[in-house]
């Protein structure tokens, strides 16, 4: 395929057009009075959203050079979303502002490499200032404030803060679609995995169709149990204690399953069997987690252990186990706090090293089950379109809240970025490097300008007044009042704010130092079939 090449200002100008198209679309959503954008979907109803990264990913431009500019900004939004989970619109606004001012200077004859150095230096300094401003987040009300600002909904803020209070900052909070119109929070305490009883005859509560075991022993093995003789010595020991038994094994089949069921029905002893969760190496890891949580040992040939030789000391224990047809939940395992803490530390270390998003998600689920539990926010709405929009809002709020717990909070509404400008006054460089610093200085004001504009105010007037206010005071675009942003609960996670600036500065610097752009040349359209002459008859037809 032949290529089309543009150089110097032609290349940068074409990319800037694409950047402007994408950024102008996304930035209308910024702030408490930001608007929505409607996205056409290839199937189903259109998506109405104000989520910056979702909008950016949908934009494809016909002109290849413009599209490359748009895709570079989309990459900024995606990267910010990956790191902090929110702040994608802010990152887009910052990128546009830095590139636009930078191009003016490059076109006027400035050295783009020097400007890039100045941009990077200013960004590093501003990020350090933002980190210094950060206030740690611990209490429930602060968490609710972060979620409320991100989602623009106090109700969502309550759901997120309740969920984090129940399962902890390491706990897993998942978002699912509700079957009804109401949004609700469901918290599963203890360890739960998606395996149910192997026979419905093991049910103890026929009304709810669940098996409930109080103070059970838990046999954990990666082996298949087909012969009852393999576990008979162990069953005899358990029978003497008059306590129930939960068997977690690779499988229970052959004569073993009907024998266990028969003894359950006759009331000889209370036993429930379930398959082990997961597959392959992930199954081994989950069984080890379960053993540590309950204070037991995995009966496996890898450790030289045999079911015939198992004793009560090898079994796990818990305050309660509940098993339905799809799930097993174990509450208050008897494992030692030290062993569980060590296991949690190992999993956290694995999460930091892992590169696969899927593997990271699975590790986080394991971590949550050990650390506290799983909370499920079930999103309800009147229509499918509203449901999709609500899910995106809650996902952003959840990500922002986690970022706030991790690195603290700063004044919201773009105020922290403007406050960080003071740190740039300490930088004293020359020539193009100083020009780059000044470009970032101007760009840091842009989010406040845009938030004000979206709320119907003049951005320049707001910025002029904000410069004269003391640090922490900002403009509440929702009410039109000047307030202490932290006290008013208008806050942003420090991680979100600094990630937006870091990613915007990085990509903007690369765009400004671009001297040539290579794109695929559009293929000429195939000639259309000539129209049929109506005077020509259809042969063979009357």
UniProtKB/Swiss-Prot annotation:
Keywords associated with the record: ATP-binding, Chaperone, Cytoplasm, Isomerase, Nucleotide-binding
EC class (word): isomerase
GO cellular component: cytoplasm
Main localisation: cytoplasm
Sequence positions that bind ATP: 29-32, 86-90, 413, 476-478, 492
GO aspect biological process, one term: protein refolding
UniProt EC number: 5.6.1.7
SUPFAM superfamilies: GroEL apical domain-like (SSF52029), GroEL equatorial domain-like (SSF48592), GroEL-intermediate domain like (SSF54849)
Keyword Chaperone: yes
Pfam families named in the record: Cpn60_TCP1
Record family assignment: Belongs to the chaperonin (HSP60) family.
HAMAP family hit by this protein: CH60
Protein name in UniProt: Chaperonin GroEL
Lineage: Bacteria, Bacillati, Bacillota, Bacilli, Lactobacillales
